[in-house]
A protein has these predicted regions:
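Basic, Lys/Arg- and aromatic-enriched nucleic-acid-binding interface segment
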Residues: 10, 121-127, 140, 144-212, ...
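Well-ordered beta-strand positions in beta-sheet-rich domains
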Residues: 24-27, 163, 229, 240-244
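Catalytic-site neighborhood detector that most strongly recognizes the C-terminal catalytic loop/helix
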Residues: 165, 231-238, 250, 281-282, ...
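A short, charged, amphipathic alpha-helix used as a generic interaction element across diverse proteins
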Residues: 29-45
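Short, Arg/Lys-rich segments that mark the N-terminal edge of DNA/RNA- and chromatin-recognition modules
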Residues: 1-29
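Basic/aromatic-enriched alpha-helical hairpins
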Residues: 43-47, 62-120, 134-140, 293
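Short, basic (Lys/Arg/His-rich) helix/loop patches that form interaction surfaces
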Residues: 98, 176-199, 208, 243, ...
Length: 368
């Protein structure tokens, strides 16, 4: 039996009691909404399609996102990335401050439109995927009985695949900016990167087309400098992969600053531990700072030489572009697409089209 009572000046309290079922109650601003809710619950009870929504009415989206981030995310391979996406979602109080029962496709669409003013459609789509995953898990595992609104939300159009390549001059300035600064007696550093791992990491990325996560997870026990291979037991797509190392890649690994030396001063081969003992956050920040230094150096050199700077020099360059650049260079050496996929780790050969972008001037030379 349903009951509606007025609470204060602006609230209506609705209750539904039925033997054999838990009591249901909810507060509304308008009496009409309370009456509609009572009819819905009573209809569900009559048809035995009753859904207990008390947990959904009690929890906000923020509470569910935080619980998921703490309990589920840490067990995933992409834990760090997913956790960052959840942090971004939690910043939108207009969405995550709502109760789970109040999250409709309209509310998600409003959030989508706000977010599209800040980031690309691809980024928004990935954040929408996280929302959908959290809704499904909460409903199936935690008894949060609400419909997932995501299937009703129109997805933003995907941005065109990136085809940003580094020019030879851009690469030269970037690598120079990644060269380590020297610590002074007063604790300050001369101009350059403070993190000694950034330069060799970027150089190896440009030589092997390995992903950022693969490079950071690379262990010395999986590196064979004599056979010139680097084994990756766990990659993004879940498959193990052994990456062939060029002579340049081997030289980069041999020159790493952490390689211990014998009493005679000669470096010995490492057999265990992380090849690049740094973090994804340190790499992201260090790479961004190096881009800024490289641009400043370039502009200063152009001014000194009295020449006009190239527009867009090192603009819109991200670390993942090193994989694109490396794959494009490898495509020039490996004409067999299967060989190329074995190096880069692409299971879908069509994906390699994103990375094979020969320069027009290079193709012109081949044409004669």
């Amino acid at each position: 039996m349903g009951q509606i009572t007025k609470r204060g000046e602006y609230q209506w309290r609705a209750k539904v009691r039925r033997k054999g079922f838990p009591e249901q109650s909810r507060t509304f601003t308008y009496k009409e909404d309370a009456e509609k809710w009572v009819r819905t619950v009573e209809s569900e009870l009559e048809t035995k399609g009753f859904i207990d929504r008390r947990e959904a009415e009690k929890n906000t989206l923020a509470a569910i996102l935080k619980r998921y981030q703490q309990e589920i995310t840490p067990g995933k391979k992409s834990a760090a990335i997913e956790s960052v996406k959840i942090d971004v979602l939690l910043r939108d109080a207009a969405l995550v401050g709502l109760k789970m029962t109040a999250i409709t496709s309209t509310e998600v669409a409003r959030w989508r439109d706000r977010r599209l003013k800040e980031v690309t459609g691809g980024t928004v789509n990935r954040e929408i995927d996280v929302l959908s995953t959290v809704f499904n898990h909460a409903r199936r595992e935690w008894g949060i009985h609400v419909e997932n609104p995501i299937p009703l939300v129109k997805r933003p159009e995907k941005a065109r695949a990136r085809d940003r390549r580094l020019s030879h001059e851009e690469e030269s300035y970037l690598l120079a900016a990644l060269t380590g600064g020297v610590r002074q007696q007063d604790g300050t550093f001369t101009k350059g990167a403070r993190n000694p791992w950034l330069l060799p990491l970027v150089r190896l990325a440009l030589e092997t087309a390995m992903r950022r996560g693969e490079l950071l997870a690379l262990q010395w026990e999986n590196v064979d400098l004599k056979r010139r291979t680097a084994h990756l037991p766990d990659t993004k797509n879940g498959d193990a992969r052994t990456v062939p190392l060029s002579t340049t890649a081997v030289s980069i690994l041999k020159e790493l600053p952490s390689r211990p030396k014998t009493e005679r001063g000669k470096p010995v081969e490492r057999v265990a531990g992380s090849v690049f003992p740094t973090t994804a956050m340190a790499l992201r920040k260090g790479f961004a700072r190096a881009i800024e230094r490289a641009q400043q150096d370039y502009l200063a050199d152009c001014k000194a030489a009295r020449r006009r700077p190239q527009p867009g020099f090192l603009s819109d360059v991200h670390f993942h572009d090193t994989r694109h650049e490396a794959a494009s260079r490898l495509a020039e050496k490996l004409s067999n697409v299967l060989e190329l996929s074995a190096v880069t780790g692409h299971r879908d050969l069509r994906m390699l089209k994103r990375y094979y972008h020969p320069r027009a001037e290079d193709l012109a030379k081949k044409l004669g």
